[in-house]
């Protein structure tokens, strides 16, 4: 499981380092939503962290862009990423914005 270098963290998340450790161990957590990037569809998606319990995600771990305390907060984080993308690049291509440093 990989985490984005500038991980987006929602305001309701009290201890992101502890949550990261627990996610790496596939611990069952309540009220933790993940903003993920999957290479296959080149989109950001919101999942409850319990989705990681499925075998598919153990073989194909997602790239985690952000952690939120609710689905609504995760959507707000995606909106914030979109606003940053438009202000810095003039485009709403979130994936290109998030990974532009890695391509340079």
Regions found by a protein language model. Name each.
Residues 55-66, 89-94:
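A signal for specific C-terminal beta-sheet/loop modules enriched in small/flexible residues
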Residues 60-64, 69-84:
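A short, charged, amphipathic alpha-helix used as a generic interaction element across diverse proteins
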Residues 85-104:
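Charge-dense polyanion-binding interfaces
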Residues 28-62:
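Short aromatic-glycine-(Arg/Gly/Cys) micro-motifs in beta-strand/loop hairpins
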Residues 1-22:
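Negatively charged, low-complexity tracts enriched in Asp/Glu with abundant Ser/Thr
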Residues 21-29:
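Short, compositionally biased leader-like segments
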Residues 25, 37, 80-85, 100:
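A general structural signal for short secondary-structure boundary/capping elements
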């Amino acid at each position: 499981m990989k985490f984005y270098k500038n991980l987006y963290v929602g305001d309701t998340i009290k201890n992101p380092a502890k949550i990261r450790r627990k996610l790496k161990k596939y611990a069952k957590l309540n009220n933790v939503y993940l903003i993920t990037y999957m290479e296959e569809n080149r989109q950001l998606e919101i999942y409850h962290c319990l989705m990681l319990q499925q075998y598919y995600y153990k073989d194909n771990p997602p790239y985690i862009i952000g952690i939120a305390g609710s689905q609504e907060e995760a959507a707000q984080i995606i909106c914030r990423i979109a606003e940053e993308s438009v202000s810095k690049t003039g485009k709403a291509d979130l994936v290109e914005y998030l990974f532009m440093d890695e391509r340079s």
